[in-house]
Amino acid sequence: MAILKICTYPDPVLRKETVAITVFDEKLVKLTEDMAETMYDAPGIGLAAPQIGESLKLVVVSTARREDSKQEYMVMANPEIVEKEESQVDEEGCLSVPELLAMVKRYRKIKVNYQDINGEPCSMTVEDRFAVVLQHEIDHLNGILFLDHLSSLKRNLYKKKVKKWFLPR
């Protein structure tokens, strides 16, 4: 396994359209293992393929119950939200949007159709924090960052902060 480079805002790969996964092979297994290792090393609780420069509809999410438990994760290929209910506001951060935590409104309960690592169709209904994590990661597959859910004022303040990071000293 390998730790991959995480692409950060404003890298254009984060805004690219992703393509569906059609081949489920050892190469995909290796990619998901590397993504999981990268996610846990960061540390994070979810990672989408665009965040490591791959324009694929692929997500890994932590299923560990506590931070100190072993590294358990699930793979979701071609995930799609097919049902959504209610809303909630929760704090989010993103490995691709460093140094920003913000309150974001999301659905409280969602149903997601996806394929597992073997290409088998699956469906799951999730609530609360896990629903937030999945919506956040699926947004990445559509070129959407959690930054896009913020007010224009907060978004512009963050963009100015990022520009300062790249100014010559």
Swiss-Prot record:
Catalytic activities: N-terminal N-formyl-L-methionyl-[peptide] + H2O = N-terminal L-methionyl-[peptide] + formate
Q: What is its EC number?
A: 3.5.1.88
Q: Record's NCBIfam families?
A: pept_deformyl, PRK00150.1-3
Q: Which PANTHER family match?
A: PEPTIDE DEFORMYLASE (PTHR10458:SF22)
Q: Does the keyword Magnesium apply?
A: no
> Which residues constitute the catalytic centre?
137
Gene name tied to this protein: def
The GO molecular function terms of this record are: metal ion binding; peptide deformylase activity
**Name this protein carries in UniProt:** Peptide deformylase
Q: Which residues form a coiled coil?
A: none
| Pfam families in the record | Pep_deformylase
One biological process GO term for this chain?
co-translational protein modification
Q: Required co-factor?
A: Fe(2+)
Amino-acid positions noted as binding Fe cation in the UniProt annotation, renumbered to this chain: 94, 136, 140
Question: Which EC class is this protein assigned?
Answer: hydrolase
- Matching InterPro entries: Peptide_deformylase (IPR023635), Peptide_deformylase_sf (IPR036821)
Question: Taxonomic lineage of this organism?
Answer: Bacteria, Pseudomonadati, Thermodesulfobacteriota, Desulfobulbia, Desulfobulbales
Say which family it is in.
Answer: Belongs to the polypeptide deformylase family.
Q: How is the cofactor bound?
A: Binds 1 Fe(2+) ion.
For this UniProt record, the keywords arranged alphabetically read as follows:
Hydrolase, Iron, Metal-binding, Protein biosynthesis
